[in-house]
Swiss-Prot record:
It comes from the Eukaryota. It comes from Gibberella zeae (strain ATCC MYA-4620 / CBS 123657 / FGSC 9075 / NRRL 31084 / PH-1). It is found in: Endoplasmic reticulum membrane. PANTHER family: GPI MANNOSYLTRANSFERASE 2. The gene is GPI18. The chain crosses the membrane at residues 11-31, 106-126, 139-159, 160-180, 197-219, 240-260, 299-319, 351-371, 400-420. This is GPI mannosyltransferase 2. It is a multi-pass membrane protein. GO terms for cellular component: endoplasmic reticulum membrane; mannosyltransferase complex. Belongs to the PIGV family. It is an enzyme of class 2 (transferase). The keyword Transmembrane helix applies.
Length: 423
């Protein structure tokens, strides 16, 4: 039996490639245990939280950088103000599973398991999303393989929110694409749109950039409102309800953590923090600026030039694939211009615009080096690379991207497991 036969056994083939690549990355992480850590934060954290009962080597090697915040939240809840920079979704999931199965002291390994399972689900969701949009099995397979080999590397194996975020985003995209294949007035379409909103809402609890998913529902709402200019009908009004509910669910996913923080810090008789008096009292934007110095052009300093250079290849891929696909969707999905409806092309263009916006914000506002892991949750560049691999004129470009992302992921894996930058 050929495990790599994408035509007859695509799911088995993708799962086999996924298992092989993850085994390779985990071997790198375990191999890094030979040398001493650059930073002792992990060992100190586990000593404080778990005492003499130290976790296994794999857990310590993957609990690096921001994973410490996620794991502290999973074990102790949000104790310090700066912890609100990180989503509540991943720690809540770990805490719930550990409580349900009585797996206290196993939080890190449970989080690692969640990351792996959600990454695999994301791979399969991307495959099915591509099939729904253009029915090209080879393109779907290649795009999913590129997602397996994501430059995010060990970040999507570690106790981070990147894998669950990609999972919920791709599931949301898939449900939205399924809705476009149904009759405009059908219950199936409306339920799929609401389900997509719920998925994106959950993604907002994992990473704040899940809010970009709301653009899909805003576009659909505008379309429905414009349709009302030609006359009112019950079906047109009902058609408007689903994207409105979907958009509200996305907003709730983003706002809910802010409300919880406001109730904790701003709703008592104690001295309130400065952000409580802001016009929009968001703890997230406050702690990002206060503790991580995130803001417009704040990262544009001479000492950050190496990080901009490090991020340049991935930014170039995101911008090039995004802008090309916005102009002509077939540059990303070869068959999307032929045999698919205008709604599907609009969806692809919207996803390309969201990806382009992410890249621009990474340049102007974010810590630019995180783009390699943020990119893992956006499908357009995977389609674009896959289409390059299938196009003889652009095939060398596609192979070049594959070589780059695999080398980047492998090297970054060794650095990550040793607690070395960049993060």
């Amino acid at each position: 039996m050929n495990l790599l036969d994408y035509k007859s056994r695509p799911i088995l083939s993708l799962t086999s490639i996924f298992a092989a690549w993850k085994s390779f990355l985990l071997a790198i992480a375990l191999g890094a245990s030979i040398g001493p850590d650059y930073d002792t934060s992990t060992s100190l954290f586990f000593a404080i939280v778990h005492g003499a009962s130290s976790p296994r080597s794999l857990a310590t090697r993957l609990t690096r950088w921001d994973a410490l915040y996620f794991m502290h939240d999973a074990v102790k809840g949000k104790v310090y103000e700066q912890e609100w920079a990180f989503g509540i979704g991943m720690p809540a999931a770990v805490r719930s599973i550990c409580g349900l199965l009585n797996l206290q002291r196993w939080e890190a390994l449970v989080a690692i398991a969640i990351s792996h399972v959600s990454h695999l689900v994301a791979v399969l969701a991307l495959y099915q999303l591509t099939i729904v949009l253009c029915n090209d099995r080879k393109l779907a397979y290649l795009a999913s393989v590129v997602h397996v080999l994501s430059p995010a590397g060990l970040f999507i194996s570690a106790p981070y929110a990147e894998s669950p975020f990609a999972c919920m985003s791709f599931v949301g995209n898939l449900l939205y694409a399924i809705s476009l294949k149904s009759s405009p007035d059908s219950l199936k379409r409306n339920l799929a749109v609401v389900g997509a909103g719920l998925s994106y809402g959950i993604s907002c609890t994992l990473r704040s950039n899940g809010l970009f998913g709301g653009v899909l529902f805003a576009v659909e709402t505008v379309k429905c409102l414009l349709a009302l200019r030609n006359g009112f009908s019950i079906s047109k009004i009902l058609r408007l309800v689903a994207p409105l509910i979907g958009g509200i669910l996305v907003a709730v996913g983003f706002v809910a953590p802010q409300v919880l923080a406001w109730m904790r810090y701003c709703n008592g008789n104690e001295e309130q923090r400065a952000w409580c008096g802001h016009r929009i009292p968001s703890i997230y934007t406050f702690v990002q600026a206060e503790y991580w110095d995130v803001g417009f052009l704040k990262y544009w300093t001479p000492n950050q030039i190496p990080l901009f250079l490090l991020a340049a290849p991935m930014l170039t891929i995101l911008l090039k694939s995004g802008t090309e696909t916005m102009r002509e969707p077939s540059r990303g999905l070869g068959a999307v211009a032929m045999g698919t409806n205008e709604e599907s092309r609009l969806l692809v263009r919207t996803l390309a615009a969201i990806q382009t916006l992410l890249a621009v914000l990474a340049i102007t506002n974010y810590h630019v080096q995180i783009i390699s892991r943020l990119s893992s949750g956006y499908p357009v560049w995977y389609w674009w690379v896959a289409s390059c691999l299938m196009d003889k004129q652009r095939q060398s470009l596609g192979y070049g991207v594959i070589v780059f992302i695999t080398m980047y992921a492998a090297i970054q894996g060794g650095l990550f497991a040793s607690f070395l930058p960049p993060a």
